[in-house]
């Protein structure tokens, strides 16, 4: 499988975070056209760290968790929990306005 990332995002947040940001952006864009999960006016993606390590076998659980933490701390992503079952602690991710700007800018450079 081929993975892409934006070098400007990688410089600021790290290569792992840039790879995850592009993956999440693609998933959320696809979801927004198929069956959007809307909460708080944003399209959210429910995805556990364990699930992401399945898509990225070259990243460990901790590397994935740390990369997501950097994106949340850098205000590229926001994290929430909208699970129907209370004890389900799977996180949901959405791009902030700043994150949407970064990803749209990234797409503009690649086209």
Predicted regions and their residues:
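Short recognition helix of helix-turn-helix/winged-helix DNA-binding domains
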Residues: 1-54, 97-100
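Intrinsic disorder/low-complexity signal
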Residues: 5, 61, 83, 87, ...
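Long, compositionally biased, intrinsically disordered segments
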Residues: 14-15, 79, 104-108
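Winged helix-turn-helix DNA-binding recognition segment
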Residues: 28-91
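Charged low-complexity intrinsically disordered patches
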Residues: 69, 96-111
């Amino acid at each position: 499988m081929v993975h892409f990332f934006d070098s400007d995002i990688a410089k600021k947040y790290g290569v792992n975070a840039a790879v995850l940001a592009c993956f999440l952006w693609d998933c959320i864009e696809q979801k927004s056209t198929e069956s959007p999960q809307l909460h708080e006016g944003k399209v959210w993606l429910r995805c556990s760290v364990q699930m992401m390590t399945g898509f990225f076998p070259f990243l460990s659980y901790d590397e994935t968790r740390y990369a997501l933490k950097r994106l949340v701390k850098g205000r590229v992503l926001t994290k929430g929990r909208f699970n129907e079952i209370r004890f389900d602690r799977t996180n949901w991710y959405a791009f902030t306005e700043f994150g949407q700007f970064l990803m749209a800018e990234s797409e503009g450079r690649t086209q």
